[in-house]
UniProtKB/Swiss-Prot annotation:
One of its GO terms (biological process) is translation. NCBIfam families: L12. The keyword Ribosomal protein applies. GO terms for molecular function: mRNA binding; structural constituent of ribosome. The gene is rplL. InterPro entries: Ribosomal_bL12, Ribosomal_bL12_C, Ribosomal_bL12_C/ClpS-like, Ribosomal_bL12_oligo, Ribosomal_bL12_oligo_N_sf. Keywords: Ribonucleoprotein, Ribosomal protein. Homodimer. Part of the ribosomal stalk of the 50S ribosomal subunit. Forms a multimeric L10(L12)X complex, where L10 forms an elongated spine to which 2 to 4 L12 dimers bind in a sequential fashion. Binds GTP-bound translation factors. Transmembrane segments: none annotated. This is Large ribosomal subunit protein bL12.
């Protein structure tokens, strides 16, 4: 019996974020492709103007969970909204990006919460 596109979409729609991440990695390995977004071509005209722009989107990276793993898992759940298992898997896989494309204030708040729980976090 052949699997339809609708069946595949339904199955993918029921996956957790971590399961989707594993699926993407499996696709990358099996087919030798990258899931990275293609960069848009640079617009000509404003020479050097782009270099002076201030970064507006930041990524919070969990570098290390430190000695208080349980507290860090709780903080990760609070920041990301992940379930217990997904948050534990993310903490165990450190260093890992925790939140991507967030404002500077949100990134700093997440970093502060992680550090208060005993983790080492970075903003990139």
């Amino acid at each position: 019996m052949a699997i339809s596109k609708d069946d595949i979409l339904e199955a993918v729609g029921n996956l957790t974020v971590l399961e989707l991440n594993d699926l993407v990695k499996a696709f990358e390995e099996k087919f030798g492709v990258s899931a990275a977004a293609m960069a848009a071509p640079a617009a000509g005209g404003a020479a050097g103007g782009a270099a002076a722009e201030e970064q507006t989107e930041f990524t919070v990276v969990l570098a290390d969970f430190g000695a208080n793993k349980v507290g860090v898992i709780k903080a990760v759940r609070e920041i990301t909204g992940l379930g217990l298992k997904e948050a534990k898997d993310l903490v165990d896989a450190a260093p890992k990006p925790l939140k991507e494309g967030v404002s500077k204030a949100d990134a700093e708040a997440a970093k502060k919460k992680l550090e208060e729980a005993g983790a080492k976090a970075e903003i990139k």
